[in-house]
């Protein structure tokens, strides 16, 4: 069927399903929210330019923000990339390997250990954010 096995409202890509959730949560709470949706559901991991494009177009079609709200809305969107306490390297919350990246800038402020899609570049790049910041997010599961 057309959904390729994804639940209603989720976007299929290459054997996985992506869902955008507009409620604003911290990175950890967003990951927990995704995990409660079902087995092996996590914040989204991105492994190719094509997958990134699919997520960007999903966000473009689902952004609920009107122009007037822009000042108050924190429009970056959490993905599953984080740097766990005491580790030097970035990791995806679903355990997949880091084989693609689209960082907004080089160099990472030490306190910012979670990554979000940057709305100022139409979600084409990632930036580091404080994990406690509350943002909308993308969950993903394998079909």
Swiss-Prot record:
PROSITE patterns noted in UniProt: C_TYPE_LECTIN_2
UniProt-listed SUPFAM superfamilies: C-type lectin-like
Keyword Thylakoid: no
Keyword Transcription regulation: no
Subcellular location: Secreted, Extracellular space, Extracellular matrix
Cysteine disulfide partners in this protein: 6-17, 34-139, 114-131
A Pfam short name: Lectin_C
Phosphoserine modification, residue list: 66, 68
Gene Ontology cellular-component terms listed: extracellular region
Keywords: Disulfide bond, Extracellular matrix, Lectin, Phosphoprotein, Secreted
InterPro entries in the record: C-type_lectin-like (IPR001304), C-type_lectin-like/link_sf (IPR016186), C-type_lectin/snaclec_domain (IPR050111), CTDL_fold (IPR016187)
Taxonomic superkingdom: Eukaryota
CDD domains in the record: CLECT_REG-1_like
Domain C-type lectin: 13-140
GO molecular function term, any single one: carbohydrate binding
The name this protein goes by in its record: Rheacalcin-2
Naturally occurring in which organism (per UniProt): Rhea americana (Greater rhea)
Source taxonomy: Eukaryota, Metazoa, Chordata, Craniata, Vertebrata
């Amino acid at each position: 069927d057309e959904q390729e096995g994804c639940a209603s409202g989720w976007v299929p890509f290459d054997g996985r399903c992506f869902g955008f959730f507009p409620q604003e949560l911290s990175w950890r709470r967003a990951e927990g929210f995704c995990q409660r949706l079902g087995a092996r559901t996590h914040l989204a991991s991105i492994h190719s330019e094509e997958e990134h494009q699919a997520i960007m177009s999903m966000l473009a079609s689902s952004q609920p923000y009107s122009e007037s709200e822009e000042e108050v809305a924190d429009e970056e969107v959490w993905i599953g990339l984080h740097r766990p306490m005491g580790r030097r390297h970035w990791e995806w919350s679903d355990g997949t390997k880091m084989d693609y990246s689209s960082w907004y800038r080089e160099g990472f402020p030490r306190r910012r250990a979670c990554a979000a899609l940057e709305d100022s570049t139409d979600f084409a790049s990632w930036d580091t954010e404080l994990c406690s910041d509350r943002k909308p997010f993308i969950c993903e599961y394998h079909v």
